[in-house]
Design a protein with these regions (language model features):
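Active-site capping/gating segments
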Residues: 112-113, 227-248
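Phosphate/diphosphate ligand-binding glycine-rich loop within oxidoreductases
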Residues: 2-117
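Residues in the short beta-alpha loop(s) of Rossmann-like NAD(P)-binding domains
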Residues: 10, 154, 211
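Rossmann-like adenosine-cofactor binding region
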Residues: 158-229
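Short glycine-rich anion-binding loops that position phosphate/pyrophosphate groups of nucleotides
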Residues: 59-66, 133, 181-184, 211
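NAD(P)-binding Rossmann-fold cofactor-contacting core
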Residues: 143-160
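Glycine-rich adenosine-cofactor-binding loop
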Residues: 8, 104-107, 114, 118, ...
Length: 248
């Protein structure tokens, strides 16, 4: 039986295990999908050693960047350009050796799920957070003709701090994407520290989180007329893309 899996920490919120095992069952595929909740990325190599029938892996928080050093190759169109990996294809070589190739399907899921929501006035975007997922969002927005800027609690050059989100900035940047875990179950009372009172119906708020269905970030945006969307469609689209990668 072929095996697929997910590495990350924590994985209590994971969608992938149920999605792929249901897919295997309904399509009669002799495979299983397992969650590997690891507290340190160094445990990744032990997973590979102990599971020789692994054909593919997904990668989630906080290992999308840390896993790269364990890979043999990066897909130049996605993972290498973005600098983050959420899909690993495991290719069997002669003499029992394996080749690990890293891809990024987050960019596919994000761009395809937000593209139809963008209007002519959506020219600039704020990306809340600077982790692995934020990099795919950054490149996805660029590909759609939207100018992105990162917002961080500890901003680097060219980035904004939350204290710099003035009325002028908020009026200019009408797309806001949350890539932080703030508001994810079970800590549903949390949300990014942006000036929600400055939001208008011109704003589009996109939260990469999908549990709960409506985060506090989204709810506070709706209170001021903003259009909101969660990350479930992105998750589905990136999962479809991952399956295509593993079987290409």
């Amino acid at each position: 039986m072929d095996k697929y899996g997910l590495i990350g920490f924590p994985l209590g919120h994971s969608f992938s295990e149920g999605f792929f095992n249901q897919k295997f069952y309904s399509e009669g595929i002799d495979a299983c999908y397992v969650n590997y909740e690891i507290a340190d990325i160094a445990e990744f190599k032990h997973i590979l050693q102990d599971n020789p029938n692994l054909k593919g892996m997904n990668v989630t928080i906080p290992y999308k960047e840390k896993v790269i050093k364990y890979l043999d190759e990066l897909d130049p169109e996605t993972a290498k350009k973005i600098g983050a990996v959420n899909v690993i294809k495991i290719v069997s070589l002669p003499k029992g050796k394996k080749k690990l190739i890293g891809y990024n399907s987050d960019i596919v899921g994000f761009t395809q799920s937000i593209e139809s929501m963008l209007l002519p006035h959506h020219k600039k975007a704020l990306i809340l957070g600077t982790g692995g997922a934020s990099k795919a969002v950054y490149h996805g927005l660029l590909s759609l003709g939207v100018e992105p800027t990162f917002v961080s609690r500890t901003p680097s050059k060219g980035q904004l701090s939350y204290a710099q989100l003035t009325p002028g900035v908020m009026a200019e940047y009408t797309v806001i994407v949350n890539t932080t875990p703030l508001g994810m179950y079970p800590k549903v009372e949390e949300c990014p520290d942006i000036p929600y009172e400055l939001l208008t119906p011109n704003h589009l708020l996109y939260d990469l989180l999908y549990n709960p269905d409506e985060t506090l970030f989204m709810r506070r945006g709706k209170e001021h007329g903003a259009v909101v969307k969660n990350g479930l469609e992105m998750l589905l689209l990136q999962a479809f893309a991952a399956w295509d990668i593993w079987n290409s």
